[in-house]
Design a protein with these regions (language model features):
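Acidic/His-enriched low-complexity segments
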Residues: 1-215
């Protein structure tokens, strides 16, 4: 998707990909057999335009489909996780390259409903040619596909997610902006309130389930 605080498309050179560059999406897609991600609630502080950083709280509602597991992994690239809560309980986690591994407080049960809260922040990533999050031309905007990145899904550069073409979820976006920038986003605007000075908080709801690269 192309949204957030404005939208511009850049014409960029293409890059030929070799056969050996192909990436096996099987393990990523297989997660959707074990977990059903229902909803993402994303609280994003996008007020640091000049520092080109963001702070986020992702609240993720999901259902366990296959019990017995004690850990699960999410896609998250470039950004650093501060803490994770599982149904309100702080849990251990680790980050390895573009994966966030979260330890469940107890073996998971089939049918269990979980609210996962992830606090994170840093400088969001982008593709060398086209895609990802940009701070440019007095805008902050996101392009959901990395043109030369394998795999190409780019939800993971701005929030923890199941970043594949199979999993679909609904979304709530809560975007904090400043310096005259106003959010333009997926879904419909619920409210926009002033937090003092030139800082705004806008809330958007998207009730139609979509994959991460469109979010």
């Amino acid at each position: 998707g192309c949204h957030a605080l404005g939208c511009k498309h850049h014409v960029a050179p293409t890059k030929s990909l070799l056969v050996e560059d192909n990436f096996d999406m099987g393990p990523s897609i297989a997660r959707s057999d074990s977990f059903d991600v229902v909803h993402y609630d994303l609280m994003l502080d996008m007020t640091d335009y000049w520092g080109q950083t963001m702070q986020g709280l992702a609240t993720i509602d999901f259902t366990v489909l296959q019990g017995g597991g004690t850990t699960m992994w999410w896609d998250l690239e470039s950004l650093v996780v501060d803490s994770v809560h599982w149904n309100g309980e702080a849990v251990t986690f680790s980050q390895l390259e573009s994966q966030l591994h979260v330890d469940a407080p107890a073996p998971m049960q089939a049918g269990e409903q979980v609210v996962l809260e992830v606090w994170y922040g840093g400088e969001p990533g982008s593709d060398p040619y086209w895609g990802g999050m940009y701070f440019a031309s007095d805008l902050i905007y996101n392009l959901g596909i990395g043109l030369t990145t394998i795999p190409p899904n780019f939800g993971r550069v701005w929030y923890p997610c199941f970043d594949n073409f199979v999993e679909r979820a609904t979304y709530t976006y809560r975007l904090r902006t400043a310096d005259g920038r106003r959010a333009h986003n997926q879904g419909h605007l619920i409210e926009e309130v002033s937090l003092g000075g030139d800082t705004l908080l806008s809330t958007w709801e998207l009730d139609h389930p979509i994959p991460t690269h469109l979010s």
